[in-house]
Amino acid sequence: MAVEGGMKCVKFLLYVLLLAFCACAVGLIAIGVAVQVVLKQAITHETTAGSLLPVVIIAVGAFLFLVAFVGCCGACKENYCLMITFAIFLSLIMLVEVAVAIAGYVFRDQVKSEFSKSFQKQMQNYLTDNKTATILDKLQKENKCCGASNYTDWERIPGMAKDRVPDSCCINITVGCGNDFKESTIHTQGCVETIAAWLRKNVLLVAGAALGIAFVEVLGIIFSCCLVKSIRSGYEVM
């Protein structure tokens, strides 16, 4: 039958889309973890809407992977209930992704503000807390930055000499290189702006990926509905 052949094609395309969903799920989880790592490095301890975004992204990725598994089982067994469940869950994921995108846009400035406040707060403990010093040094070294807004923030730290910055601010790091420094020998840009730039760059990547994922999800919903209709009508699509 022509319809049977058409449904076989739809079923095959649905399998391809399910593989794409798995890849998208892994991508979302990776992006969420990467953003969460940056938030941890920026020492943002407060639980706010901005800091929860990566957790939501990871959760959506994990749920998408689970939904793809349900869809695969439903398509393989040609189970009406599983395919309906797959289509409904896929629609819910699309709504959550839209909500996350809106939240990311709304709270973008708040995230930067969190970075700044938390970074400056922890700078006060640089000379008295070795753990904090290690984290800040790692952050400054990896991001090639110095201070929150810029290197002059270190001048306001109790116990820190006016002509000194941490060695991790130096372009070429050696022991004591932060003493009697020159602007030409250190990174002058603040870490808050550096991290904010990283986040802005990745927000664009996430936005582009989200559009691609949304398109694939729409196709998934359409194909699953076609398969559901075929199953309900009693066609054999093995």
UniProtKB/Swiss-Prot annotation:
Residues listed as glycosylation sites in the UniProt record: 130, 150, 172
Superkingdom classification of source: Eukaryota
Motif mapping: Lysosomal targeting motif: 234-238
Q: Name one Pfam family in it.
A: Tetraspanin
Q: Which InterPro entries match?
A: CD63_LEL, Tetraspanin/Peripherin, Tetraspanin_animals, Tetraspanin_CS, Tetraspanin_EC2_sf
Q: Which UniProt keywords apply?
A: Cell membrane, Endosome, Glycoprotein, Lipoprotein, Lysosome, Membrane, Palmitate, Protein transport, Secreted, Transmembrane, Transmembrane helix, Transport
Report the GO terms under cellular component: cell surface; endosome lumen; endosome membrane; extracellular exosome; extracellular space; late endosome; late endosome membrane; lysosomal membrane
Q: Which tissues express it?
A: Detected in mast cells and platelets (at protein level).
Instruction: State how it assembles.
Output: Interacts with TIMP1 and ITGB1 and recruits TIMP1 to ITGB1. Interacts with CD9. Identified in a complex with CD9 and ITGB3. Interacts with PMEL. Interacts with KDR/VEGFR2; identified in a complex with ITGB1 and KDR/VEGFR2 and is required to recruit KDR to ITGB1 complexes. Interacts with SYT7.
* Protein name, per record: CD63 antigen
Native species of this protein?
Answer: Rattus norvegicus
